[in-house]
Amino acid sequence: GQVVVHRDSPLQQLSDLDRHSLAYQEGGQFSTNLLILRTLREQKIDFLPRFLDTESSALRSAFLRKYDAALVNNYLMRLVPPQVTSQLRVIHSGPALPPPAFIARRRIPPVVVQKFRDALLAIRDDQPALLESLLMTDLVDADLDRDYGIMARHLGGGDRR
């Protein structure tokens, strides 16, 4: 995740958010928000939260200077037109996180899960442009420790299951 401000903003770093507004999607991008909000709390930065319905609204609020900063996901920034991103500046980037995982409920028969997995891997192998249009760099089998251990490390360890 990233904390962005309007390019003309006087805010230069995360600590400058003290007593300034930070817009973000309430409940959205859970892991991204969680880690950056934890950093703000650990650094005792007393920001003014502004909860919005969408992440795009948060970004728009920084662009239009309605709020001082916005907390957004890195993927969103790749979807925004250059004429918007050129008016924004990143003042903080959180740790790199794994992309979202596809997870199947236990009640779904394993044969159906395997067919879905095979179809996704076929897209990866046969239609790489389709993956790129979805902002996916690759599809791989998820590994709990490799892919999600970062959350446990940042949140103080413990059982991740």
Locate predicted features.
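Hydrophobic residues within well-ordered alpha-helices
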Residues: L17, S61-F63, F116
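Short helix-initiation/N-cap motifs at beta->coil->alpha
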Residues: L48-R60, A96-P98
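Flexible hinge/capping segments at coil-to-helix
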Residues: V5-L22
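Solvent-exposed coil/turn segments that connect beta secondary-structure elements
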Residues: R7-S9, G27, Y75-L76, A96, ...
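Ligand-binding cleft/hinge of the Venus flytrap
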Residues: F30-L52, R78-T85, A152-G157
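A ligand-binding cleft/hinge motif common to bilobed small-molecule-binding domains
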Residues: S61-L64, D68-L88
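Periplasmic-binding protein-like
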Residues: G1-Q2, S31, Q83-H154
